[in-house]
């Protein structure tokens, strides 16, 4: 059985950035957060959302600068510290204290920074 994917969610974070995300599964189940690479967007995780949404609240955001998320024009708005902050704030926005974080490529750099800087937010890093 595959979970239904719900697109078109938006999270306005405390830092002012608005992120688009897709999700599958039910809130309340463990959060499985997928971070895409460059130059991708949430759809890179389509199959994983369908599969893992049966057991988790699976979420795949469009990272800052990609697809339907905010696309700041200043290069300085893409510093690793700010990209990491987006992930940290998204976890809280979704109502979770931690998550299983799955990432690759560009998203992997942010995932590592979250795990190192805020280890209490990451139950597992994949």
Show where each model-derived region lies:
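Alpha/beta-hydrolase fold catalytic core
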Residues: 1-32, 53-57, 96-97
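Alpha-helical elements of Rossmann-like donor-binding domains used by nucleotide-donor carbohydrate transfer enzymes
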Residues: 6-8, 17, 44-47, 51, ...
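Conserved HGGG/HGGXW glycine-rich cap/lid loop of the alpha/beta-hydrolase fold
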Residues: 22-71, 90
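Glycine-rich, phosphate-binding/catalytic loops in enzymes
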Residues: 49-52, 75-78, 119-120
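Conserved hydrolase catalytic core segment
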Residues: 97-126
């Amino acid at each position: 059985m595959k979970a239904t994917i719900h697109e078109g969610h938006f999270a306005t974070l405390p830092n002012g950035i608005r992120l688009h995300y897709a999700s599958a599964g039910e809130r309340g189940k463990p959060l499985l957060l997928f971070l895409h690479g460059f130059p991708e967007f949430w759809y890179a995780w389509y199959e994983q959302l369908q599969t893992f949404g049966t057991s988790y609240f699976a979420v795949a955001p469009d990272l800052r600068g990609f697809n339907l998320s905010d696309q700041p024009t200043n290069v300085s708005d893409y510093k690793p510290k700010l990209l990491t902050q987006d992930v940290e704030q998204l976890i809280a926005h979704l109502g979770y204290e931690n998550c299983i974080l799955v990432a690759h490529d560009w998203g992997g750099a942010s995932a590592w920074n979250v795990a190192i800087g805020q280890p209490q937010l990451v139950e597992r890093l994949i």
